[in-house]
Design a protein with these regions (language model features):
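Acetyl-CoA-dependent GNAT
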Residues: 3-11, 20-23, 34-44, 50-121, ...
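Extreme N-terminal starter segment of soluble prokaryotic enzymes
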Residues: 15-17
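Acidic/polar helix N-cap motif
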Residues: 22-25, 153
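Charged catalytic carboxylate motif
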Residues: 28, 128-129, 155
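Hydrophobic pocket/interface hotspot
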Residues: 29, 33
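C-terminal "cap" of GNAT-fold acetyltransferases
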Residues: 105-109, 146, 150-202
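Short phosphate-binding/catalytic loops that engage adenosine nucleotides
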Residues: 125, 142, 165
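Conserved GNAT acetyl-CoA-binding A-motif
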Residues: 137-149
């Protein structure tokens, strides 16, 4: 997959753009991740998850994901406001559940993370990230894109719904060492014109 071949569609304006992540972005990605978790999900995530956050380990993990992705279908992209990294998205091939059959329409990709630092929200960065990931996985042969959302996360659900996504009927419960977290899976068909992100929704 050649990321540069699909990025012109999703670059946005001169002040706001999306590009492939570079190794030097890893520390900023880790910082945005924990800031966003604490701000947006502090009430949902167990305190231990945030209290035990290891910035150095997270930075190293993101650097590895950028430099040596586990498959050609994995990738990380970042959203820029001028030259500042303000958000990121990570994606890869989806793993089927034990009771699930492959989609006859073609392979499914999974959006592992899409986070925009809260102070940069409502400027279209989330929409541009989603458009870039959709283009990248579509160019890699995926017919469908999915994401797992916390059942209580109505803000993210509203964002994906406005982009033409919908729950696909699957749910799972995560054991985080505290209260169980229930997640709902959302999806979009990549050839569906209604699944195009709307500019400025996040």
């Amino acid at each position: 997959m050649n990321p540069e071949s699909v990025f012109p569609r999703a670059t946005g304006s001169a002040d706001a753009s999306v590009r492939p992540a570079f190794p030097d972005d890893a520390a900023e990605i880790a910082r945005i991740q924990v800031v966003t978790w604490r701000t947006a999900y502090g009430d949902a995530l167990p305190a231990a998850v945030l209290d035990e956050w290891d910035t150095d380990a997270a930075t190293a993990s993101w650097r590895t994901a950028i430099i040596a992705p586990p498959t050609p279908g994995h990738g990380v992209v970042v959203a820029l406001e001028r030259n500042d990294v303000v958000g990121f998205a990570a994606f890869g091939p989806a793993e089927l559940t034990a009771a699930e059959q492959p989609d006859p329409a073609g392979p499914t990709a999974e959006l592992v993370a899409l986070l925009v630092e809260p102070r940069w929200g409502r400027r279209g960065h989330g929409s541009r990230l989603l458009a870039a990931v959709s283009d990248l996985v579509r160019s890699g042969g995926a017919a469908r894109l999915q994401v797992w959302l916390l059942e209580s996360d109505r803000v993210s659900a509203g964002f994906y719904e406005s982009a033409g996504w919908a729950p696909d009927g699957w749910a799972r419960t995560l054991d985080t060492g505290g209260e169980p977290l229930r997640e709902i899976r959302w999806h979009a068909l990549l050839d569906d014109p209604d699944a195009a992100p709307q500019e400025g929704t996040q």
